[in-house]
Amino acid sequence: MGTSYPKLNIAAFGMEKIVPDLDALGVFTRLLARSATGQPVTTYTSHYRRPREGGEYHIIIVDNGRSALLSKPDHIKTLNCIRCGACMNTCPVYRRSGGYSYTYFIPGPIGINLGMAHAPEKYYDNLSACSLCMSCSDVCPVKVDLAEQIYKWRQDLDGLGKANTGKKIMSGGMKFLMERPALFNAALWAAP
């Protein structure tokens, strides 16, 4: 209602919000409502085609690092996200922490990926707030492979100089034990 009265309207949104036609808009509107809140259709959607008579309508398409993400083939699917929140609703870490496990302003699995795409040196610690259970990838309505992307970001930590030495040593030790079944069984037997 607040946009129907003024003679000047300014809309700002990310480039991933652009849909090719009204048929696609219908699909995304239903998909967003079902995935976010379980409703058959959303209760509030605004559609703007042109300015009102004698008015102006300006559209600002915000890039905010999105085009840089296009150059990362392993993470390009992040741009498919419709921000429904289904990944957060199913994430065991998010459900238990309420989002406080994350330092990026968007929590959950999608926030981990967006934070790493935006500033990996600042948000790399969010990668440990994921159990890689893959529930987020299974529930995503637009098939963003969130867990796979988080796994790939973890592999990139060495290149960023942010890999956790303690975790690397522990993983190396586990790899060593797992490759030697007799030694692994002996370790299990000796454990308290």
For every predicted segment, state its role.
Residues 1-71:
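Iron-sulfur-associated redox domains of electron-transfer enzymes in respiratory
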Residues 26-36, 88-91, 95, 154-157, ...:
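Structural signal for hydrophobic packing residues in well-ordered secondary-structure cores
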Residues 44, 52-78, 93-192:
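Ferredoxin-type iron-sulfur electron-transfer modules in oxidoreductases and energy-metabolism complexes
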Residues 81:
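Short Cys/His-rich zinc-binding micro-motifs
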Residues 84-88, 133:
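Extended amphipathic alpha-helical segments enriched in small hydrophobics
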